[in-house]
Amino acid sequence: MSLKETVSNPYSKWLEATGPENDVIISSRVRLARNLMGYPFPHVLGHENADKVLYAVQSAVAQKSLQEAVGNLELSRMTELSSIERQILVEKHLISPDMLEQPEKRGVVLRDDEVISIMVNEEDHLRIQCLLPGLQLKECWDLANTVDDGLEQIIDYAFAKEQGYLTSCPTNIGTGLRASVMLHLPALVMTRQINAVLTTLSKLGLTVRGLYGEGTQATGNLFQVSNQVTLGLTEEEIIDNLITVALQLVTQERAARRALHKEQLHQIEDKVWRAYGLLKYARTMTSNETMTLLSDMRLGVDLGVITGIPPGIIMELIILSRPAFLSKVKGADLNPYQRDIFRATLIRERLNSLSNE
Amino acid sequence: MLCDRCQKRPAEVHFTQIINNSKKQMNLCSTCASELQAGSLGFAPQLNLHDFLAGLINHHFTGSSIQTNALPQMRCEKCGSTEAQVAKTGLFGCSECYSQIGERVRPLLKRIHGSSIHTGKVPKRTGGTALIAKEIRILKNQLQNAIKYEEFEEAASIRDRIKELEQKLQ
């Protein structure tokens, strides 16, 4: 699949609800921050040097041995993409919103299934990302590690014995590793246990964010939990810590779901079917309402209240109903009101196509 | 003083916010204050990580988080970034900054990470002595285990390997 096809398709490999613990854990991600020795960091990098970094990365990803190890990687400059296509890459979590500024300095490397992506000249020269469905942090780390080793064959990294990999922001030095899991925690929210859980996580040196990163709200009961500390621990220790915590959260969420299902069966069934009904028949739908209803519907799928709906459809519909994606499908810019109508139409069509299958 | 927001009722709540040396003050009546607080986070915008870090670095250089006059101007010889710039953005200009300006930030790293020594991955080709140091660390762990389980022959061979590597480092 080419990059042009990637942005036309709402489906990403990491949306498949096939990974381990997928009833609670939507996806796992590992990110490695790396910089090239001898160049200023991106926020003070001139155009000429930015170009040199892009070329260096382009030749590093083109190495035969790397491609043999991890598959076909290709660099695209941000300027080769339209502004809607760039926005879609953000909505699909393949690049960060910061990449939309100064596109002439930046580029993105993608494997065609979107599992591997590398941002070039974002906050650091390289941000190697691996994204997989369910709880697969170890697998993500192994893959990112292999890509990192491959790039290091050609690229001289900025590295110091004591401080490890040097990054533009001191919160990332050392391993440069940020690992995160995206969790769907509707029952912990409904039973009002979530605040206690979040407080505990912050005591364990973990950060919690909403679906679209720093500062975003946890709409749709989706939470991203990631490590805060990157220096002084090994990569394996960081990954193991996060896996342990993620499994704890899975246990707690499942217990809360069982309790809800047992004690408030009618309320839960009502909530789930109302959500399904609205998604299937409503004529306008805001983005926030969509997230809330999809969360309720997914809970219904996981509890077995609704059958015949693949769990992956929920994330697919979330991506599908983001503003840039809607514009792309429609082939025109939409105002917020038109978007709400078109969003409802697309969701309706997708859900009705499932019941006909 | 009237409330900044409704301009009708007297201001009773005085809210001061200092981010990155810039000071913002809001004077609100109790009704507006509770509405703003309940309504959104807009009242106290969420501090982004860089602003927060910039504040910490600034505090570290100057000993005060609200001092606004000139900062000591240590400058990175490689990229020309000054302490003031680093303190303002929370970002270093280049990898050399870590050895130039960074020396003074070392205690801060410890405060952020709880440690200031990297124990993780080392680049294979360019890691140099760091790679050897890492191998020694791993071997020392293995040595401890071998002693614990009374595998003395194994322990002796690990010890020899450590000695060999330590000589390389000298």
Swiss-Prot record, chain A:
<feature type="binding site">
    <location>
        <begin position="27"/>
        <end position="31"/>
    </location>
    <ligand>
        <name>ATP</name>
    </ligand>
</feature>
<keyword id="KW-0067">ATP-binding</keyword>
<dbReference type="GO" id="GO:0004672">
    <property type="term" value="F:protein kinase activity"/>
</dbReference>
<protein>
    <recommendedName>
        <fullName>Protein-arginine kinase</fullName>
        <ecNumber>2.7.14.1</ecNumber>
    </recommendedName>
</protein>
<dbReference type="InterPro" id="IPR022414">
    <property type="entry name" value="ATP-guanido_PTrfase_cat"/>
</dbReference>
<feature type="short sequence motif" description="RDXXRA motif of the pArg binding pocket involved in allosteric regulation">
    <location>
        <begin position="339"/>
        <end position="344"/>
    </location>
</feature>
<keyword id="KW-0808">Transferase</keyword>
<feature type="binding site">
    <location>
        <begin position="209"/>
        <end position="214"/>
    </location>
    <ligand>
        <name>ATP</name>
    </ligand>
</feature>
<dbReference type="InterPro" id="IPR000749">
    <property type="entry name" value="ATP-guanido_PTrfase"/>
</dbReference>
<dbReference type="InterPro" id="IPR023660">
    <property type="entry name" value="Arg_Kinase"/>
</dbReference>
<dbReference type="InterPro" id="IPR014746">
    <property type="entry name" value="Gln_synth/guanido_kin_cat_dom"/>
</dbReference>
<dbReference type="InterPro" id="IPR022415">
    <property type="entry name" value="ATP-guanido_PTrfase_AS"/>
</dbReference>
<dbReference type="GO" id="GO:0046314">
    <property type="term" value="P:phosphocreatine biosynthetic process"/>
</dbReference>
<dbReference type="GO" id="GO:0004111">
    <property type="term" value="F:creatine kinase activity"/>
</dbReference>
<comment type="function">
    <text>Catalyzes the specific phosphorylation of arginine residues in proteins.</text>
</comment>
<feature type="binding site">
    <location>
        <position position="127"/>
    </location>
    <ligand>
        <name>ATP</name>
    </ligand>
</feature>
<dbReference type="GO" id="GO:0005615">
    <property type="term" value="C:extracellular space"/>
</dbReference>
<feature type="domain" description="Phosphagen kinase C-terminal">
    <location>
        <begin position="24"/>
        <end position="256"/>
    </location>
</feature>
<dbReference type="Pfam" id="PF00217">
    <property type="entry name" value="ATP-gua_Ptrans"/>
</dbReference>
<comment type="similarity">
    <text>Belongs to the ATP:guanido phosphotransferase family.</text>
</comment>
<keyword id="KW-0418">Kinase</keyword>
<feature type="binding site">
    <location>
        <position position="93"/>
    </location>
    <ligand>
        <name>ATP</name>
    </ligand>
</feature>
<keyword id="KW-0021">Allosteric enzyme</keyword>
<dbReference type="GO" id="GO:0005524">
    <property type="term" value="F:ATP binding"/>
</dbReference>
<keyword id="KW-0547">Nucleotide-binding</keyword>
<feature type="binding site">
    <location>
        <begin position="178"/>
        <end position="182"/>
    </location>
    <ligand>
        <name>ATP</name>
    </ligand>
</feature>
